UniProtKB/Swiss-Prot annotation:
Annotated function: Forms part of the ribosomal stalk, playing a central role in the interaction of the ribosome with GTP-bound translation factors.
Protein name in UniProt: Large ribosomal subunit protein uL10
Keywords: Ribonucleoprotein, Ribosomal protein, RNA-binding, rRNA-binding
SUPFAM superfamilies xrefs: Ribosomal protein L10-like
Subunit text: Part of the ribosomal stalk of the 50S ribosomal subunit. The N-terminus interacts with L11 and the large rRNA to form the base of the stalk. The C-terminus forms an elongated spine to which L12 dimers bind in a sequential fashion forming a multimeric L10(L12)X complex.
NCBIfam families: PRK00099.1-1
Assigned protein family: Belongs to the universal ribosomal protein uL10 family.
Gene Ontology CC terms, in alphabetical order: large ribosomal subunit
One Gene Ontology term of the molecular function aspect: structural constituent of ribosome
Lineage: Bacteria, Pseudomonadati, Pseudomonadota, Gammaproteobacteria, Enterobacterales
Gene expressing this chain: rplJ
Length: 165
């Protein structure tokens, strides 16, 4: 279906607006994946706070101009599915990584985070980022361990001082 100029402008405006508010982006090639599987992916994306869209490469190049995802321009070759993580930087990467494991024909092309291009081979860097809750839990456990260790050392020093006296 041919798009008229107004439709193209609307697509560019929508994708550009989403890109400005996104934390990260992942680009993939979904050739050979069934419609049912893509529907499952889109549903999982909505639940994870990921905006997904298949967009023409020329329109996508225009949409990412002036955003942190401009570094992805070289990845816009062939059929392009772009996903923006809106709530957590690793959400789209994690979603695509899991989907690619189950679907051999689904290929992740590249990702971008804070203006840095992440090649498909290093997508784990983005996919393994802890969520906000996980990061807080790790920080709290580290602080708790440090406090407990300090208490143990203090008690040992008091015990040694009493033994010496």
């Amino acid at each position: 279906m041919a798009l008229n100029l107004q439709d193209k402008q609307a697509i560019v405006a929508e994708v550009s607006e989403v890109a400005k508010g996104a934390l990260s982006a992942v680009v993939a090639d979904s050739r050979g994946v069934t419609v049912d599987k893509m529907t499952e992916l889109r549903k999982a994306g909505r639940e994870a706070g990921v905006y997904m869209r298949v967009v023409r490469n020329t329109l996508l190049r225009r949409a990412v101009e002036g955003t942190a995802f401009e570094c992805l321009k070289d990845a816009f070759v062939g059929p392009t599915l772009i996903a923006y993580s809106m709530e957590h930087p690793g959400a789209a990467a994690r979603l695509f990584k899991e989907f690619a494991k189950a679907n051999a024909k689904f290929e992740v092309k590249a990702a971008a985070f804070e203006g840095e291009l992440i090649p498909a081979s290093q997508i784990d860097r983005l996919a393994t980022l802890p969520t906000y809750e996980e990061a807080i839990a790790r920080l709290m456990s580290t602080m708790k361990e440090a406090a407990a260790g300090k208490l143990v050392r203090t008690l040992a020093a008091v015990r040694d001082a009493k033994e010496a006296a």
